[in-house]
Amino acid sequence: MKRLPFIAGMLAFCMLVYTCTVSKFSTPNQAGNPYPSRNFVSNPKYNFLTPEESLQTFNLPKGYRLEIVAAEPMIKEPVAIAWDGNARMYVAEMLTYMQDADATGERKNTSRIMLLEDTDNDGKMDKSSVFIDSLLLPRMIVCVNNELLVNETNTITINSYRDTNGDGKADVKRTVFLRNNYNVNDANMEHQRSGLDWNLDNYLYLTYDPVRFRYANGVLTADTMHSGSGGQWGVTHDNYGRLFYSSAGGENPLVRVQVNPAYGALDLPDQVSNEFQEVWPITATPDVQGGLKRLRPDSTLNHFTASCGQSIYRGNTLPPDLVGDYLVCEPVARIIRRAKVLNVKGKISVQNAYYRQEFIASTDMNFRPVNTYTGPDGNLYIVDMHRGIIQQGNWTKPGTFLRNAIDEKGLAKNIGHGRIYRLVYEGNKQQAQPRLLDEPASKLVTYLNHPNGWWRDNAQKQLVILGDKSVVSALKQIATGTQDNLTGPVTHLARIHALWTLDGLGEMDKPTLFAAFTDEHEQVRKTAVWISEALIRKNDPEIFTRLAPLAQDAGHDVRLQLFLSLYSSNSPSAVNLLATLQNRQATNEMFVATKRAMDKNTDIRTYGARLGNMAVTERNSILSGSATFNSLCVTCHGAGGKGMAIAGSASLPAPPLTGAANRLGGSKENLVKIILHGLTGSIDGKTYPSVMPALGANSDEWVSSIVNYVRYEFGNVSSRRRSGDTTAPFVTPLDVKTIREKAGVRNNPWTLEELAKQ
């Protein structure tokens, strides 16, 4: 899907800025370079290549090779995949996505989900069926037992589909999550929810909105959080349940990785370095949104602008040094980055695994990687949308730099294709296919010790869904390391999964939990602290006594998790233990930053109370605008509208909003026009490489809520309203309707010069 670039809901000044230092493209000459020699393509061809021809265009480290799992005509326009417990692959296809440069027909309900099977276990799909059709751009899929949960674009409803007669087509549909009082931002389909990642803690996480789900009794139950993830397209987790997001709109390949979003929003300025932000295509990439500032002199993309589809490799068939590495797609650059994940005193950062080189790169200009996964066979799977245009229609308007490149190169004609690859390593043998859906709980328990994270995750998920309590005793033995009927010794990963499975079944007991507090492995102890939150919330007196020694634990992650788990408790025991922790960690960067992030949660909780003197309609409008801003707009504007630096740089993707409404004269009409039709040109004497997209497809109520929030929080309306001046103009949906009608049809964005003359 493109770059999934900009956050919808942004205001005038929400224009992409990046003034990175131009770096000369060079091939690494350092000792130990794992790549064969290759040539840089300065004048690439944009013609269609067959799957076999495309395979010849990839640059890979020695020993690795790509294999075709599925391709057109079996699949078209794939964006996401999911396996059930028996390794049947479901493929979400966005068949109406950017079928021309104007996004004609994009909202037709003609997309689908394919069901693919590898019947002879040779690694290539040989059987397919249309599992579901007549969908609107399906964007989230996840398998639960014999069902597939699906979310489509322009709705937050999640439906379950099931095939009951074995013909490969869904014949039973039911709704597992429905919320009618939610206004979906349908002006730009790039900026809606994605993910549904079943994490180790048995919550399903997604991007954008401050919500996560629990699946139980056949339905999803929402659990609200203080703030959104800041991510955009895709979410993944590692062996310990740490979540990884990326933001194309914020031009940031890694966000919100420091703590679970349930605890608050935390990013550190050096979690992604300036060096990491640079990308190294092996071909010129002139079809960028934003113009020449995003290109080096040799026409290669100079930094991440479309990060998406990230994963942590957790398999067992690729080299061991890949396990735990972070993989993130950049479809504009036609690359996939591999990064080493560093944990220094509890602070996470990433480092390119290669010097000025990418893990996977192609000269096929239609290679558009949008998702990566660890598969049941332990290999790395790559979803290639394989098309000419990757950016959504908001960024391909006539006259733009990108549109000119699209028309000149003929990119619009490359549609209706799609590839799924798997990355394999020489000498590895094909693994046996799983049959998790057919096996009893007693067998599933043994897979918690499997070397492939896919098996561990899906065994845990299946055990929790089945709710079979007959395995509780075995799970407790694994959790405490005393189980002896597994294949090989009980690993710390098996103990972690056993703990979470017990928690998911509602069968965690104190002896098992307290034993885990003293486990030899730091991550098991951290997991136990995380799970102990149920007892902390109950103010169980024994839990605080048992947790106290962990305030001096040698593991930074253990102490940080203890801080996170205790922070919201009002128990005197918790407060005292928290004070002890804080005193001992007063100079620890992670503790200081985490406390600051969690303190902001209080501001979020009390925001409504601070609007208490307003009329109900005004207060509700600002609260709605605040929710939109803090789930979408913060990606570029940053928390509190102070700006969000591009990873590893002092540059901002959009100007700070503090004082922005004043700079525009506080005019409600101008702000409404900007949201309706967009903005381009210079701002305060500075020209940005992108334009603010038109968001007029949203409702009048939605537009007014954003305007009211920005004017209240960042403009001159703020001080007047807070001082009780009720004459400060409030924007109503009727105001928006009137301004919309007065402005009429407008195909081009405004400039500040034009608005000043209005």
Show the residue positions of the predicted features.
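Structural detector for internal amphipathic alpha-helices that build alpha-solenoid repeat scaffolds
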Residues: Q431-P434, R456-G467, V490-E507, T512-T518, ...
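Electrostatic cytochrome c docking/interface patches
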Residues: R605-N630, T635, G640-A645
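Short inter-helical turns and helix N-cap capping residues of alpha-solenoid HEAT/ARM repeat scaffolds
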Residues: P451-N452, Q483, V490-T491, E520-E522, ...
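Gly/Gly-Pro-rich "capping" loops immediately C-terminal to redox-active cysteine motifs
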Residues: N404, G640-I683, Y688-D700
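The canonical Cys-X-X-Cys-His
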Residues: V383, I420, G625-A639, M692, ...
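Flexible coil segments in periplasmic/lumen-exposed cytochrome c-class electron-transfer proteins
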Residues: A31-P34, S42-K45, Y607-S621, K686-Q758
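Amphipathic alpha-helical scaffolding segments comprising HEAT/armadillo-like alpha-solenoid repeats
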Residues: D438-V445, D468-D484, G506-F517, R537-A551, ...
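Beta-propeller domains with acidic blade repeats across secreted/periplasmic ectodomains
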Residues: V22-K443, V464-I465
